[in-house]
From Swiss-Prot:
HAMAP family: TolB. This is Tol-Pal system protein TolB. The Tol-Pal system is composed of five core proteins: the inner membrane proteins TolA, TolQ and TolR, the periplasmic protein TolB and the outer membrane protein Pal. They form a network linking the inner and outer membranes and the peptidoglycan layer. Residues 406-431 are annotated as: Disordered. Belongs to the TolB family. It is found in: Periplasm. Its main location: periplasm. It holds the Pfam family PD40. NCBIfam families: propeller_TolB. Part of the Tol-Pal system, which plays a role in outer membrane invagination during cell division and is important for maintaining outer membrane integrity. One of its GO terms (cellular component) is periplasmic space. Residues 1-26 form the signal peptide. It comes from Burkholderia cenocepacia (strain HI2424). Keywords: Cell cycle, Cell division, Periplasm, Signal.
């Protein structure tokens, strides 16, 4: 490795520890449009009894389907249609809809809502079933997301991710915020607010905890935040830098990057903060660990071969088997993320003076750039593997973007009002 390359990689590692985005006072609006050339035409009628609701379920369902890029919303008119109505499916097919949705929202004596809907296939002239959900004023949005997930899976054969959540870091003035939002960027909540940087949020497999790195004690320390209770606790405060937490599939362990003995190396620590164990034994920089979904491997970035590349080793560490290089396209590759099915690897590659998001088939080794942006970082797969969320630059500011993992359409910028946002992480399916 040349001195310039080594300094560049060390600068990258340092930047991962000290940057957390520019000012943002924001509602993140997620849009993934134009996915593929064929979109499924669907008509969603207004649900009955929605007029005075704090959230209109029908609007949420339509918006979810539209932003996925997989559906075209056919005008269903303004007349509400309950799930119990007799529907002329042929008429809806004639209007261009291959599917039709009807439903209702009714408030019970306890103040809760009963949300019912039914999905029809207008081509085969048959019902595809539906759901009956219970919601409150604050969970009507979740009910809408669950309905959209049901429709997505029934019509496309892939589980939807509308009811999942995002985490990201924004900065307002001199204050950093770790925020959690719905997958559409709505309903954002502040998990942590600090005058010091917050970086590297990582969701637990259960979706109930987020690990992250905070500089609030003037050095990088790894914490775990329990979202239901708001409780958080320190996991790694070793000498030097504590960074890049990654959960094991069973939620019992975190892989972390520590500079405990000098150069940054990969370690594991129990989720309760004990049981520190070193996994790599190199004289190089080893960082950015990420578990394969089956728990067998840890992927990581290392400059041991002369320049930053992605390697994988047994989850037990290099004592159980030598690390193997995984990326060979390009001379500078970082930020490994494995898809939920274990078939794809997303990473950032330095290309033509910029940094682009690549996706590699782990079986064939074929790798392709899937974005038209050139300041990409922090990739994160959706729980169904269909999309990759990442940070990039647009119009001179830091933004989030989402792109189909197969590169079938250009990335779409996630609109943030009032500033910039970084450090995205797409949460798992809700259990």
């Amino acid at each position: 490795m040349s001195l310039m390359t080594k300094l560049g990689f060390r600068a990258l590692v340092a930047s991962c520890l000290i940057t957390a985005g520019s000012a943002a006072n924001a509602q993140v609006n997620v849009l993934i449009t134009g996915v593929g050339s064929t979109q499924f035409p669907i008509a969603t009628a207004n649900f009955t009894n929605e007029a005075n609701l704090p959230q209109q379920v029908t609007s949420i369902v339509r918006a979810d389907l539209a932003r996925s890029g997989k559906f075209t919303n056919i005008d269903a008119g303004s007349t509400p249609v309950p799930e119990t109505a007799s529907v002329d499916l042929g008429a809806w097919k004639a209007k261009g809809a291959n599917a039709f949705v009807a439903g209702s929202v009714n408030r019970d004596a306890n103040g809760q809502y009963k949300v019912n809907f039914i999905l029809y296939d207008t081509v085969k002239q048959q019902s595809l079933g539906g759901l009956s959900l219970t919601a409150t004023d604050t969970t009507l949005r979740t009910a809408g997301h669950k309905i959209a997930d049901y429709i997505y899976q029934k019509l496309l054969g892939v589980r939807g991710v509308f009811a999942t959540r995002l985490s990201y870091v924004i900065k307002t003035g001199n204050r950093y915020q770790l925020q959690i939002s719905d997958s559409d960027g709505q309903n954002a909540r502040i998990a942590l607010s600090s005058t010091e940087p917050i970086i590297s949020p990582a969701w637990s497999p259960s979706g109930t905890k987020v690990a992250y790195v905070s500089f609030e004690r003037k050095k990088p320390i790894v914490y775990i935040h329990d979202l239901p209770t708001g409780r958080r606790y320190m996991v790694s405060d070793q000498k030097g830098n504590n960074s890049a937490p990654a959960w094991s599939p069973d939620s019992n362990t975190l892989a972390v990057a520590l500079s405990l003995t000098g150069n940054t190396q990969i370690y594991t620590v129990n989720a309760n903060g004990g049981g520190l164990r070193r996994l790599t034994q190199s004289s190089s920089i080893d960082t950015e660990p990420f578990y394969s979904p089956d728990g067998r491997w840890i992927y990581f970035t290392s400059d041991r071969g002369g320049a930053p590349q992605i390697y994988r080793m047994p989850a037990q560490g290099e004592s159980a088997g030598a690390a193997q290089r995984v990326t060979f396209t390009g001379s500078y590759n970082t930020s490994p993320r494995v898809s939920p099915d274990g078939k794809l690897l997303a990473y950032i590659s330095r290309t033509g003076g910029g940094f682009k998001l690549y996706v590699q088939d782990l079986q064939t080794g074929a790798a392709n750039a899937i974005t038209n942006t050139n300041r990409d970082e922090s990739p994160s797969f959706a729980a169904n593997g269909q999309y990759v969320l990442y940070a990039t630059q647009s119009g001179g500011r830091n933004v989030l973007a989402a792109v189909p993992s197969d590169g079938s359409a250009p990335p779409q910028i996630l609109s943030v009002q009032g500033g910039s946002v970084r450090e995205p992480s797409w949460g798992p399916f809700m259990q």
